[in-house]
Amino acid sequence: MRSSTNKKATLVCVECLSRNYSVNKSGLTQKQRLEIKKFCTTCNAHTLHKETR
């Protein structure tokens, strides 16, 4: 069985701190934390979401 190098990452809204999204992140190619502007249902706006560990 092949071991997976992809890691599950949870994205958290910087304004309301709600955990809205979970994504698969390549552990070998991306060493920095993800920062993506996505829609937050709690804030009802597009806000910056950062990866948690």
Curated annotation (Swiss-Prot):
GO terms for molecular function: structural constituent of ribosome. It holds the Pfam family Ribosomal_L33. GO terms for biological process: translation. The keyword Ribosomal protein applies. Keywords: Ribonucleoprotein, Ribosomal protein. InterPro entries: Ribosomal_bL33 (IPR001705), Ribosomal_bL33_sf (IPR038584), Ribosomal_zn-bd (IPR011332). Signal peptide: none annotated. GO terms for cellular component: cytoplasm; ribonucleoprotein complex; ribosome. The keyword Cell cycle does not apply. HAMAP family: Ribosomal_bL33. Belongs to the bacterial ribosomal protein bL33 family. This is Large ribosomal subunit protein bL33B.
